[in-house]
């Protein structure tokens, strides 16, 4: 899949397609050596993205430098193996997907990409920063609970978060 804002150009996505034969999945990265950022994200978005990635890596032991880049490609076999088990939407969807795939032993390559921040994108991180950061953090916490002995707590957790969001 690729994000609809076209931050990852079709040519860069084509590079992922070329490599899918070597693995079960290929993800684009803006953070590794060889990546080209035509136009960087604004500071707050970079800060939030980096913090989210570091927290996701620490909480789930993921080896990827950029879990949130919106260009990923997986084999049908890999997706079919984990799709019924995925429990997260919102911000931690990518983390959930990558975590499930790595736990099942699927090989995922992370490749540098050419990426351009789209200033006109409908999602304005700066305007939503103080609302997004807690939601991003809570998405990771919920996912961590799903993969812990405390997974039964998730229902109560979901009810609590639902009440907080309605306020």
Which residue ranges define each predicted feature?
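Conserved residues at the C-terminal ends of beta-strands
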Residues: 2, 29, 114
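Short beta-strand-to-loop acidic/aromatic patch adjacent to the donor-nucleotide binding site
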Residues: 1-7
